Regions:
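Single conserved hydrophobic/aromatic residue that forms the stacking wall/gate
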Residues: 1-6, 10
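Short, functionally critical alpha-helical segments immediately adjacent to catalytic or ligand/cofactor-binding
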Residues: 20-37, 96-103, 142
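Glycine-rich, acidic and aromatic/proline-enriched surface loops and short helix-turn segments
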Residues: 29-34, 47-60, 102-106, 144-147
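Substrate-binding clefts and substrate-entry loops adjacent to catalytic sites
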Residues: 34-41, 49-91, 111-125
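Primarily a LysM-type cell-wall glycan-binding module
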Residues: 156-188
Length: 188
């Protein structure tokens, strides 16, 4: 399974690799409640809630056999790259976080409607209702995750098991090949 401590390690690695603030590791709290199997009404999936098209742009395969949007590690690296590219465009973390929620097209439209303003709080009224609450929710999640001890909140170690599926194999395969393809050690 994926423990919260383990998930924090790969999130930190991906964010560090792209020079991103470590606070972004809390974005999946808002996106999916840290559930790698979460699916939204709109069809977004996984820890980072990628739509199929966006996932494909960032190298996440999604077909009848596999949905890499639900792979916490691959999706985290894809999300880090996406967040970096949006920061290169907007240069403002509030806008980046809002764009992660509603898409850059919606942010660009809000900026146009706000006469070119690029301050999140000045385009706030031009954003979808869900996105208006998204940035404050992210700020709140960061506060709670940083200052939980000051409020007598005790963290609990969670261990959400990885989702599994059955795949039919039509050819002979050695366990070494399967282990190699799945990138897991072969137990002796």
């Amino acid at each position: 399974g994926y423990s919260s401590a383990a998930s924090d390690v790969y999130k930190r690695q991906a964010l560090d690799a792209y020079g991103l603030p470590l606070e972004l590791r809390y974005l999946p709290i808002i996106e999916s409640a840290l559930n790698p199997s979460a699916v939204s009404r709109a069809g977004a999936s996984g820890l980072w809630q990628f739509m199929i098209g966006t996932g494909k742009i960032y190298g996440l395969e999604s077909n009848s056999l596999v949905d890499e949007r639900r792979d916490p590690i691959k999706a985290t690296w894809a999300a880090a790259r996406y967040l970096k590219e949006m920061y290169d465009i907007y240069g403002d973390w509030n806008l980046v976080i809002a764009a992660y929620n509603c898409g850059p097209g919606t942010i660009n439209k809000a900026i146009r409607r706000a006469n070119g303003e690029t301050d999140y709080w000045k385009i706030y009224n031009y954003l979808p209702k869900e996105t208006r609450g998204y940035v404050p929710a992210f700020i709140a999640a960061n506060y709670v995750m940083t200052y939980y001890c000051d409020h007598n909140i005790c963290p609990m170690e969670t261990n959400i098991p990885a989702s599994t599926d059955t795949v039919q194999v039509n050819k002979n395969l050695h366990f070494e090949q399967i282990a190699d393809l799945c990138n897991v050690p072969l137990l002796s």
